[in-house]
Amino acid sequence: VSDLPSPAAGPIPAAFPLAADRPVPAPGVTVRPATVHDLPRVAEIAAPFVRDTCVTFEEEVWDVPAWHRKLDDVAARGLPFLVAEVEGPAEPGSPRGTVVAGYAYASAWRPKPAYRHTAEGTIYLDPAHAGRGVGTALLAALLEALAAAGVRQVVSVVADVPEAAGSLPLHRRFGFVEAGRLTAVGFKHGRWVDTILLQRSL
C-alpha cells in the first residue's frame, strides 16, 4: 500500500510513531497472536459482557466453535487477533504460571472494497486483571500489527455506557479522537444505547 495517497487533512491527527511517544505497557504483560488453545479463555472473558452488559451489542454468547470461526476469518483477512497474558494460574496450552487476561482483534470496517485500508479494533479485558496495563499492552500491539498490515485508519466503536467508560481514556492515550456519535442505535436490556466513534490514523 506504499503507493496510496496520504489521507486528506482533517480532524484526525497524524499518527505519532508507534514505537515511541506512546503509553508504555506495564511489565509482566505478554502479548502474542491468539491460537485455538486460547479460545476457551477468550469465550470465558467475552461471555459476561454479552450476557450482562450493553458494552457489546451481541446478544448471544459465542461458544468456542464460533470463536474458532472468528479467528479463522480474522486470519483470512490478514488482520491480527491477539491475547495478553499475565502471571496467574496456568491454563492448558499456556506457559506455566500465566493466564490470558484479555484479547484484541481487528475486523473489516465495512464490506465494500474501498474500505479495505480501514479496520475496526476490538478489545476486551477480564475485569479481574484491571489496572495491570493489559489494555495498554493490547492496544499498543494491535496498532503495531495493523500498521504492519497496511491499515491506514483504525476505528473503535464504544458503547456510551458506564461499563465501557475505561475504553475512552485508553484509546485517547493512543491518539484516538472522537469522530462522531450515533444516537440510540442499539437496544439491549430494555434501553437504547448510543455509540461513540473513535478514530486514529496510522
Please describe what each predicted stretch is:
Residues 30-42:
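A short beta-loop-alpha structural element at the N-terminal edge
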Residues 15-17, 33-36, 59-128, 139-140, ...:
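Acetyl-CoA-dependent GNAT
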Residues 44-61, 73-74:
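Helix-loop element at the rim of GNAT/NAT acetyltransferase active sites that forms part
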Residues 123-128, 132, 160-162:
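Active-site acidic-Proline motif in GNAT/NAT acetyltransferases
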Residues 105, 157-159, 172-193:
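Conserved catalytic-core motifs of GNAT/GCN5-like acyltransferases
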Residues 146-159:
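Conserved GNAT acetyl-CoA-binding A-motif
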Residues 1-26:
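Short acidic N-proximal helix/loop "leader" segments that mark the beginning
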